Amino acid sequence: MDRRSRAQQWRRARHNYNDLCPPIGRRAATALLWLSCSIALLRALATSNARAQQRAAAQQRRSFLNAHHRSGAQVFPESPESESDHEHEEADLELSLPECLEYEEEFDYETESETESEIESETDFETEPETAPTTEPETEPEDDRGPVVPKHSTFGQSLTQRLHALKLRSPDASPSRAPPSTQEPQSPREGEELKPEDKDPRDPEESKEPKEEKQRRRCKPKKPTRRDASPESPSKKGPIPIRRH
């Protein structure tokens, strides 16, 4: 009896289960479960793939930025190309140096010519007699480089002292030291006796005349004298022949 009763109970339970959940509904439920699970799995896979792609892109960007920063850091130390550039710059500087040397040579030549002209002027002043009026050396025009400082400053001072002495001596000068042009009116003619008025050299009228003549001579521009290497002057010797090699 027990077995039969148990069998009947299982049947009733099955019928009750079938009534509550029929087989079609059960199959649909299982299908929906499978679909929902598969959709969830697909979504998880998609998100994982997207995250993996994002990580790969970020790694690529980081690697690119790191490589760029490394290349920029390597530029700062001197490379062989920069050393060659420095060598080229040094070569350019060495090439530019001869121009400065040429400029210095030209400047030396100008100073030599100036010293020669000053020596010539000294010799000319020494050859002239002491009674002749001396003129102050003309100041040379200022170059672009600035005013040229005269080297023979003592010579200029001596000239000014001589001029001052001549000015002081001009009223008291004797007829023997006066220039030859002033001696002619003062020299006595033949057969005439000297008067006491003529003998007085301190006459203001006579002292004014040599002063005026001296001033005229000072105002006249002095012709530049050049020393010839040959003893004979070119006027006596004639035109200088040109030698053609």
From Swiss-Prot:
The ranges of region (Disordered) come to: 70-245
The subcellular localization recorded is: Cytoplasmic vesicle, Secretory vesicle; Secreted
Q: Which UniProt keywords apply?
A: Cleavage on pair of basic residues, Cushing syndrome, Cytoplasmic vesicle, Glycoprotein, Proteoglycan, Secreted, Signal
Comp. bias (Low complexity)? 171-181
Biased-composition ranges, Acidic residues, are 101-129
**GO BP annotations, alphabetical order:** female pregnancy; negative regulation of multicellular organism growth; positive regulation of cold-induced thermogenesis; protein secretion; response to parathyroid hormone
Q: Where is the signal peptide?
A: 1-46
Q: Where is the composition biased (Basic and acidic residues)?
A: 187-215
Q: Which Pfam families match?
A: NESP55
Say yes or no: keyword Secreted present.
yes
**Compositionally biased intervals (Basic residues):** 216-225
Q: Which residues form a coiled coil?
A: none
After translation, the protein is modified as follows: Binds keratan sulfate chains. May be proteolytically processed to give rise to a number of active peptides.
Output the superkingdom of the source species. Answer: Eukaryota
Instruction: Give a GO cellular-component term.
Output: cytoplasm
Q: Mainly resides where?
A: cytoplasm
Question: What InterPro entries does the entry give?
Answer: NESP55
What family, per the record? Answer: Belongs to the NESP55 family.
Provide the disease association from the record. ACTH-independent macronodular adrenal hyperplasia 1: A rare adrenal defect characterized by multiple, bilateral, non-pigmented, benign, adrenocortical nodules. It results in excessive production of cortisol leading to ACTH-independent Cushing syndrome. Clinical manifestations of Cushing syndrome include facial and truncal obesity, abdominal striae, muscular weakness, osteoporosis, arterial hypertension, diabetes.
Beyond the main fields, what else does the record say?
This protein is produced by a bicistronic gene which also produces the ALEX protein from an overlapping reading frame.
Protein name listed in UniProt: Neuroendocrine secretory protein 55
Q: Which organism is it from?
A: Homo sapiens (Human)
Gene name on record?
A: GNAS
